[in-house]
């Protein structure tokens, strides 16, 4: 009963403040029993209000961390992709991409970026990306540039997905040549 109330309160607070999984209390219950026997802990999408970033140092004490990225969320103050915004390289803040519905507003992205910096300074995961582009972003990020990182592309059936010249693909899709 108390645990359930605490979890609900934590989720409400995270959603209301736009913390996006930064401090979720729910993940503190039971993580140890799963992590203690692991040879390695492979993280994927840990955002969206179900995991606390604050757990990462504790988890790494139990087993090495491998973090497979699928977007830029771990590199920014909360954006999944930064698009043309360069703020993720300098600490975020006044974010043009942050949804207005977040209570913390656009400046809250600086707080989340700083929180990530503090947590990441206490861990040393191996970062895995599915693309060379995302690997370059990991290497550029002030939050993750010191981590060992590698690219492991998703497996694709090359009999179905055939490489072709960009100009041919753009023409087939009806896109402009540039």
Feature roles, as predicted:
Residues 128, 174-178:
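Conserved donor-binding/catalytic core segment of Leloir-type glycosyltransferases
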Residues 51, 136-140, 160:
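Phosphate- and divalent-cation-binding pockets in alpha/beta enzyme and binding domains
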Residues 30-50, 64-70:
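Short N-terminal targeting/anchoring amphipathic segment
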Residues 113-116, 162-175:
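A short helix/loop element that forms part of the nucleotide-sugar donor recognition site in Leloir-type
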Residues 1-40:
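A conserved catalytic-core segment of Leloir-type glycosyltransferases
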Residues 60-61, 73, 85-128, 136, ...:
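Membrane-proximal helix-turn-helix segments that form the acceptor-binding/catalytic region
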Residues 133, 155:
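Carbohydrate-associated surface elements
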Residues 1, 55, 77-82, 87, ...:
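Short aromatic-enriched loop/helix-cap "lid" or pocket-rim segments at secondary-structure transitions
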């Amino acid at each position: 009963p108390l645990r359930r109330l605490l979890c609900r309160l934590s989720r409400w607070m995270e959603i209301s403040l736009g913390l996006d999984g930064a401090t979720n209390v729910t993940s503190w219950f039971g993580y140890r029993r799963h992590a203690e026997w692991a040879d390695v802990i492979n993280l994927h999408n840990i955002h969206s209000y179900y995991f606390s970033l604050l757990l990462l140092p504790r988890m790494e004490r139990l087993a090495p961390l491998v973090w497979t990225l699928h977007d830029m969320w771990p590199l920014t103050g909360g954006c999944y992709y930064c698009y043309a915004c360069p703020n993720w390289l300098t600490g975020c803040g006044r974010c043009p991409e942050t949804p207005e519905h977040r209570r913390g507003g656009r400046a809250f992205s600086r707080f989340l970026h700083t929180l990530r910096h503090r947590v990441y300074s206490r861990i040393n995961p191996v970062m895995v990306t599915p693309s060379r582009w995302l690997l370059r972003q990991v290497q550029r990020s002030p939050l993750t540039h010191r981590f060992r990182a590698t690219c492991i592309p998703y497996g694709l059936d090359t009999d179905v997905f055939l490489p072709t010249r960009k100009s041919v693909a753009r023409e087939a899709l009806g896109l402009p040549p540039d």
